[in-house]
Design a protein with these regions (language model features):
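Alpha/beta catalytic barrel-like cores
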Residues: 1-147
Length: 147
């Protein structure tokens, strides 16, 4: 038995003392989809302007050790995370996480800028939710977006 399995068995015993059958819970979780935010992998930096400042009320720092620096690194990190989370899930993909060599701004983004994400999601059998990005951008002023 490896460390993860030993730790699970200990947790299973503790939950059993309060009437929770963790095996049943894990079984039920197989049918519940969650949509993980893409920024879990890099603390909201994204790839549109990765050296830009986080503004607009964002409380993240964008500088944690091991943060994904490229879309490919983020996809690898997500694959690992999804392999550890029971069930099949979705990714909530923000606009600033586009994957393109083309220099574009928020008001110029097109579906083609996310083709690699779509290909990856199909291969991994993961759904995609799109989330527009309305912060940390010069066009976001006084609570208005793309003004």
């Amino acid at each position: 038995m490896n460390t993860i399995e030993r730790n699970y068995e200990q947790a299973k015993e503790k939950y059993a003392t309060i009437g929770v059958d963790t095996d049943v819970v894990l079984e039920k979780m197989q049918n519940i989809k969650i949509s993980m935010h893409c920024w879990q992998g890099d603390d909201v930096k994204g790839f549109l302007t990765p050296d830009g400042e986080l503004t607009g009320g964002i409380m993240a720092t964008g500088n944690f050790p091991g943060a994904a620096r490229t879309p490919e690194e983020l996809r690898q990190d997500l694959e690992k995370a999804y392999s550890l989370i029971p069930g099949k899930h979705k990714l909530n993909l923000h606009a600033i996480y586009l994957d393109t060599e083309e220099a574009v701004d928020l008001n110029e983004i097109e579906p083609k800028h996310f083709e690699k994400w779509v290909e990856w999601a199909k291969k991994e059998e993961i759904g995609l939710d799109f989330n527009p990005t309305f912060f940390s951008h010069p066009m976001m002023k006084d609570g208005f977006t793309l003004a």
